[in-house]
Amino acid sequence: GLLEQGLSPGQAVGIMLPTSRDYFFSFFGILLAGGVPVPLYPPVRLSQIEDHLRRHAAILNNAGVSVLITLPEARPIAWILKSQVMSLQRIMSAQELLSAGGLRSRPPLNASDTAFLQYTSGSTGTPKGVVLTHDNLLSNIRAMGRAVDADSTDIFVSWLPLYHDMGLIGAWLGSLYFSGQLVLMSPLS
């Protein structure tokens, strides 16, 4: 997987995937390998491809992403991004990561280590990155849980994509932390 590709602890890895099992596996795979996930929205509209490339190139360059995990269908976009991002060395699918085998050793983590980088949409300018440490993330999840009195009997329902901070933190990681059930829906249904 990522360690075999030379991923160093704290190195940024982009995830350009829709909400799916592959997203779950990729996000935690990056964390377990000691990397830093960088969520990106996948391309959806050809009419907005130039804007997509501009925003994503800015994010990938700013984060220093070395590996980008994406759908096989999005590889042409990923290759264009690779030509615009000097740090980007490898483009992989989630299936390539899964077929690489298990993790032999796990780098140690501290509460102050970066859990992931969340970027703004960039709708009014260049996307800006927010560093979330493991401690920040857990504090945020606990605060949200206290506000709604969340526990393991709750069923979390979300249509928000996992590359969105509320979909990722509030829905998925929140339900995981509180051992609640998570039901994911398409925003189109």
Go through each PLM region and give its residues.
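Nucleotide 5′-phosphate-binding alpha/beta core
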Residues: 4, 31, 54-113
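Short hydrophobic alpha-helical segments of the AMP-binding
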Residues: 26-31, 37, 60, 137, ...
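Conserved pre-ATP/AMP-binding loop-to-beta segment of ANL
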Residues: 92, 100-126, 131, 136, ...
